[in-house]
Amino acid sequence: RLLGKDPKKKRRTLFQRIGVQFQEGDYQKEIKVSELCKETASLYRSPADWRALCEQFGIGDKAKVAVKSLSGGERQRLFIVLALIPQPELVFLDELTTGLDAKARRGVWKTLEGLKEQGLTIFLTSHFMDEVEALCDEICILKKGTPVFCGTVEQAEKQCGCQRFEDAYLQLSDEEADA
């Protein structure tokens, strides 16, 4: 269930309440940022102001630029904007800050913390443990698609007897053994 609804039966209702940011996006070669944002906004009943979101994520000056011409970090921030256009109650973010420099990563984190404080639920997939520590209230560690730990960062560290979350993650996921 998502937001108390069966996704198989209430797909259209949930579509209006959920945002998704994919790690990679494949769009028309020449589509401009503004065109993609307008097209995305047209799918929702009450979309957010895409221009304001672009400004908030530091790509406000890129509206007339073709998506293919954006840097990797700019493209990643655009994908976050697209996920937030529906003004979702729940957003799925896949490898959120891949391709962002340290300053841009921190800026995205700060913005997401603000959205979280306003009640947005964020479901984050990440291989950056510092990002998980900074953003996640609850975590679920998977090993070959199966949950091996669910709880808080602190609980993971305690369970493994580790001082650092990254060490607990490696132990729980057996990634260190696979290397």
Regions found by a protein language model. Name each.
Residues K38, S42, P47-K62:
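Conserved ABC ATPase "signature" region
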Residues A66-L70:
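Conserved ABC ATPase signature
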Residues I80:
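Hydrophobic anchor residue at the start of the ABC signature
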Residues V91-D94:
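Catalytic Walker B motif of ABC-type/P-loop ATPase nucleotide-binding domains
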Residues V132-A134:
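A short, surface-exposed alpha-helical micro-motif characterized by mixed small hydrophobic
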